[in-house]
Regions:
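Membrane-interface junctions at the ends of membrane-embedded or membrane-associated helices
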Residues: 1-2, 27-42, 169-184
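Transmembrane-helix signature of polytopic, lipid-linked glycan biosynthesis machinery
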Residues: 58, 137-154, 168, 187-201
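Membrane-lumen/periplasm interface segments of specific transmembrane helices
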Residues: 8-12, 16-122, 135-139, 192-193
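Hydrophobic/aromatic-rich transmembrane helices and adjacent perimembrane loops
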Residues: 18, 153-173
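Small-residue-rich transmembrane alpha-helices that serve as helix-helix interface/gating elements
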Residues: 110-117, 160-164, 183-190
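Signature aromatic-anchored transmembrane alpha helix within multi-pass, membrane-resident enzymes
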Residues: 47-51, 174-201
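Transmembrane alpha-helix segments characteristic
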Residues: 121, 126-149, 158
């Protein structure tokens, strides 16, 4: 079942391909453990359903357009202008755009730039909270891959699918940490509601 879900994720979303990293880690790391070693089973081959999902997507592109990577050409065109750049370059671009584009900085560029560092910090907290390495690996790869986007305008929406962040926040053991998460969530919810009612949507 997990393989089928991974297949569908990779078929419908590029980030779905990233599930291959925690899946392979789970199989390999479990087999290499000295204690509680997990034997590799034939059902573990289901991890290969994940890249097969993306392969089917490429086949659909080829069948419809004669080019397996036609979707990249669509993303590069108007109005998306999507390219791939190094994470550091994109973070710097977010900062520059926040300075140059008045009115958009508070709803697009500052949040996207800050979100990267907040997400990275949450993943580090996950190490302290002993979150399973498969989840941390997926969260890190997902974060890095998402911020390779050379013209990002929906970073917050993309990061909504980074489920390890929610698992980590839900597992914070410190009482003060839990209250801090609750307070921050409430404050941002209030800010979002205010901006929405003010016509920033």
């Amino acid at each position: 079942l997990a393989g089928v879900v991974g297949f569908l994720a990779a078929l419908t979303r590029v980030q779905g391909m990233l599930l291959i990293f925690p899946a392979v880690y789970y199989v390999v790391a479990g087999a290499l453990q000295k204690e509680n070693r997990r034997k590799i089973k034939w059902t573990d081959a289901a991890v290969f359903l994940i890249p097969m999902g993306f392969a089917v997507y490429l086949m659909i592109n080829y069948h419809l357009h004669g080019n397996a990577f036609q979707f990249l050409l669509y993303e590069e065109g108007d109005p998306w202008y999507q390219t791939t750049k190094w994470v550091g370059t994109n973070i710097a671009q977010q900062y520059q755009n926040a300075i140059e584009f008045a009115g958009l900085e508070i709803i697009i560029y500052w949040p996207q730039m800050i979100l990267f560092f907040v997400a990275a910090g949450i993943l580090l907290v996950g190490i302290k909270e002993n979150i399973r390495m498969e989840y941390l690996l997926y969260g890190a790869v997902y974060l890095g891959f998402t911020y390779l986007s050379g013209w990002m305008i929906s970073g917050g929406r993309y990061m909504l699918c980074c489920f390890p962040l929610y698992l980590i926040l839900g597992q914070i053991s410190s009482g003060k940490g839990r209250w801090a998460v609750l307070a921050a969530s409430g404050a941002f919810f209030f800010l979002y509601s205010f901006l929405f009612l003010a016509g920033y949507a």
